[in-house]
Amino acid sequence: MLLIRRTINAFLGCIHCNLTATCILIAFVITMYVVLVSEPASVDGTMGNFLPFSKMDLATKRDRPFYSNCVNTQDYLLNPSYIKQNASFVMLTRNGELEDVIKTINSIEEHFNQWFHYPYVFLNDQPFEEDFKAKVRDVTVGALVEFGTIDEISWNFPSDVKDTFEFYNAIEDQGDRSILYGNLESYHKMCRFYSGLFYKHPLVQKYEWYWRLEPDVEFFCDITYDPFLEMLRTNKKYGFTIIIPELYWTVPNLFRHTKSFISQKGVTLGSLWKLFTKDYDIFESDDPELRDWINYDFQAKAKISEKIAIEQLLKKGDDFQQINDDKEGIMNLIHKARSRKHIVEDKFFNEEYNLCHFWSNFEIARLSVFDNDIYNSFFQYLEKSGGFWKERWGDAPVHSIGLSLTLDLDDVHYFRDIGYRHSTIQHCPHNAMGNEEFSYLASDSKFKRKNAAYDEGREFGCGCRCRCPKKKREIEDSMGFCVNIWVNLLNQQRGHERHVEALNGNEMEEHIREDYLRQFGN
């Protein structure tokens, strides 16, 4: 699987490939896609159900959409139990992105904020122009809008780093290797800022919650409830709408530094950690050598058989006739002598980063999930490693891994009912049945819809008045690897989550020894 992911990543990042190489890569990717992706695992982890994830009910007892359909927003707001939260939208942008900023604001206002009037915080590494601020205020309806400038220390790399040959050489080298955005210094700065500094800005610090926005994003469904309030009510601390694998060559050493941090600081991990890691501790045995050799379940039978065959051979002592007759034992002894222990390239302390991450250009979260001692120390540790410029660490994998140091799976919410697009990736749910129960009611004439046609409701749908683009494939189906892990873990008992059930090595060894002795005798 890792080889396949790396091949896909190489193809995605290889903008300078020649035609022949590109065709070969495309053929390989399509082949593996048919084998691995077109038949996603069912929610219980089996391959017996071939339905795409987008056509399945992924709700579990531990996490599900807050509402299974549209709600009457007017009644919701008038309910005495409704309490508006201390929350804000946050967007990092530049003066030249005004058109895309307005596009985002119009979309989130129409689908949500025209009813809830949450404030906006816009951040820029340069002062915002007056024209930019005026036009942004024109398109927000009844919401407070604040503009902030990021200070030099928060935006730029330290002078003892950025003024060195090593820094510029590392950036240029990433461009030469066609690492996506790797040669853009500004992109490295943005990732570093969002990884561990955005929540320190004074304008953001005023709030308990934030909802991240980007220029040029679209929302496809109406959000008729308050996500901040519902997260508070259900003890959720972080919410996402897309989870996908990262490009391997952007973060080759991120996990190594993370494991080093955990070891040095003695961090007690939350269960969310299991969402982002592959566990190689899949073989329970009293034999430490077997545990060390076996990384995959398919290796277990062969290694146990080898061990037993050699043990039986050695029991023959100095009887060379019996030794010579024991062909099975001799062959296994020779095989073991010639074998090298299989090294899993990115395995550290029996774990490997599986590359999954929450796509952080959309996230709704408590600021405290970042602004705490462990996460702040984690960011500082990564900062000192130089990975934000030596490699192209994105804020999405840093956020995801950093959150898993402290959060449990139950602290996280999948906003499956929120349709969302950024760049070329989109998630858009099917509408729930009965969307027509509560008709759309605009709070302002600018948001009135004429002859609006919504997607047909489905039994497994959860969206409210969604209108999904038809030409783009649903990300749950095209990159379902990480979604499958999420659903499998959430379907397990709290505190006992595993990707796969560990093999009982002692029991396997007992059965294999019995079979061996029946076949080959003493």
Curated annotation (Swiss-Prot):
Keywords: Glycoprotein, Glycosyltransferase, Membrane, Signal-anchor, Transferase, Transmembrane, Transmembrane helix. Residues 1-16 are cytoplasmic. The chain crosses the membrane at residues 17-37. The keyword Transmembrane helix applies. It is found in: Membrane. The keyword Transmembrane helix applies. GO terms for biological process: cell wall mannoprotein biosynthetic process; protein N-linked glycosylation. GO terms for molecular function: alpha-1,2-mannosyltransferase activity; mannosyltransferase activity. This is Probable mannosyltransferase KTR5. It comes from Saccharomyces cerevisiae (strain ATCC 204508 / S288c). The gene is KTR5.
